[in-house]
Amino acid sequence: TGPDDGLNQAAGETVNHLLENGIRDMFLIPADIPLITEEEINSILKAHPSAPSLTIIPSRDKFGSNCILLSPPSRMTLKFGPNSYFRHLEIAQTNGLKVNPMEFPGFGLDIDEPKDLFELLKAEGNTRSQKYIRHLNLVKN
């Protein structure tokens, strides 16, 4: 078992719940992506191809999958973990999905290590996450 097993299990359970309720799309954003904007989300929704399809946004190092829009959700099994971005692209292509990779600066930073919190502090903007980290006063000026 690895640190991403919980996310993979939660994604699988979510797919089952969506199917049971007749929902045809799944928009998954991990909780550690603090800089996304409403405009980026709207752009993803507008650019998502008709089913069967995968729209995917990588982490800035292109190793992680920081956003997935999958239609229908049952068309592929998500496998988060090391190098998940390229693994998801391969799984989608193998399963005959239209693949729509996109990149957005707000989706680039994910909080995996302490150094990522410093990146968050240095980043432009004033998100709730940034305000909270500043409030904790972890870094002395």
Predicted feature locations:
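Short phosphate-binding loop-to-helix
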Residues: T1-D25, S84
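Acidic metal-phosphate-binding loop of nucleotide-sugar-dependent transferases
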Residues: D5, I33-L35
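Short, high-confidence coil segments that cap the C-terminus of an alpha-helix
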Residues: I23, A51-P52, L97
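Short aromatic-hydrophobic micro-motifs that form the base-stacking/packing surface
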Residues: F27-I29
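Conserved donor-nucleotide/metal-binding helix-loop-beta segment in metal-dependent transferases, i.e.
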Residues: I36-K62
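Conserved hydrophobic/aromatic beta-strand scaffold that supports enzyme active sites
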Residues: I56, C67-L69
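Short, glycine-/small-residue-rich phosphate/pyrophosphate-handling segment
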Residues: L70-A92
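Conserved alpha/beta core of the MobA/IspD/sugar-nucleotide pyrophosphorylase nucleotidyltransferase superfamily
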Residues: N83, E90-N141
